[in-house]
A protein has these predicted regions:
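Transmembrane alpha-helices and adjacent helix-loop boundaries
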Residues: 1-90, 94-97, 102-320
Length: 320
């Protein structure tokens, strides 16, 4: 085993050289078009120091100013004698003791860290992926079992659903769901986007479930029935646990695709990760830097998901 691992090191080194070569080629390509890299503009789109103006509530006078480090505590007294105390950053203070102030005058600002557009876009992508993925799994499990049902109506309806959804583009489905169904039922764009993604994912999960159940030998079901289990108990306790091990890889692949498909909901004005990236480019003019960051954030979501699915698959295989 040790010899085998040592023999693989040159190949891993070659892989690293290829990746370095690709990165260098990309750098040279950008140099040829005179692109100027501005990575220093990117961090503010993840987190930045937000300013919140502190204003006088009424007419009055600056009664006292107490400086403490980088902060200043300003005490205002109005005509009735009531006091208003404001904490502001010292360098933003615009008044001195004894100055008169009017209602709405800015005394200074307070600064605090706030999430930038890319951070909010990442959060939106995550919650849309989780919610639509969970709903899609439930829809797909139900539709997949309906496709195997002995009831012709359930089988026909589930077949129509699966073929209709799989046969049309997701982008078209989002438009139909938002502009037609959403208008009739007065749905929010977030609800429409999640519903469209869930129905789309459910159709593919249904086919994965159907194929997984059908891959289990019929003898398994017959053996379960011979032990006194009914059809539902046989499916729940015997067939589905075995099928789950087989459908785990395609299910993981489907959910990874779902994370990337969330970028399409930007067409109905949902500011997820891709739309946040486009908006950041319009103000930073750092096209390549922003898109590389967006791609990296998608990888940050999908690589752990893929790794988790692989580990779960190996653990289930060891339990056999």
């Amino acid at each position: 085993v040790i010899k085998h691992k040592k023999a693989q090191w040159p190949w891993h080194g070659l892989t690293a050289l290829v990746l370095v070569g690709l990165a260098f080629s990309l750098y040279m390509a950008t140099s040829m078009i005179s692109y100027e890299w501005r990575w220093n503009r990117v961090p503010q789109y993840f987190a930045y120091k937000a300013e919140e103006a502190q204003r006088a509530a009424s007419y009055g006078t600056v009664q006292d100013i107490v400086i403490s480090g980088d902060n200043a505590r300003v005490t205002l007294k109005d005509e009735s004698g009531a006091e208003q105390v404001l904490d502001v950053d010292k360098d933003s203070l615009q008044l001195a003791r004894g100055d008169d102030v009017s209602e709405g005058d800015q005394i200074g600002v307070t600064r605090h860290w706030a999430a930038g557009p890319l951070a909010w876009g990442l959060w939106t992508t995550l919650w849309i992926s989780v919610v639509s993925g969970a709903l899609g799994l439930l829809i797909g499990l139900f539709a997949g079992l309906c496709r195997l049902s002995s009831n012709p109506t359930l089988r026909d309806l589930s077949t129509v659903y699966v073929e209709l959804v799989r046969g049309t583009p997701l982008l078209v489905q989002i438009f139909i769901f938002y502009f037609f169904i959403g208008t009739v039922l007065n749905l929010s764009r977030e609800f429409a986007g999640v519903a469209a993604l869930a129905l789309f994912t459910g159709a593919y999960v249904a086919e994965i479930v159907r194929a997984g159940v059908q891959s289990i030998a019929k003898g398994q079901n017959e053996a379960a029935r011979s032990l006194g289990l009914n059809a539902g108990q046989s499916m729940r306790h015997v067939i589905l646990p075995q099928a789950f091990k087989r459908v785990l890889p395609p299910l993981a692949g489907q959910f990874i695709s779902l994370v990337k498909d969330t970028s399409l909901v930007s067409v109905i004005a949902i500011t997820e990760l891709t739309k946040s990236g486009r908006e950041a480019i319009t103000t930073s003019f750092s096209t390549f830097e922003i898109w590389f960051c967006v791609a990296g954030l998608y990888l940050l979501i999908n690589l752990p998901l893929s790794h988790l699915a692989s580990r779960l698959e190996r653990r289930l295989a060891q339990s056999d």
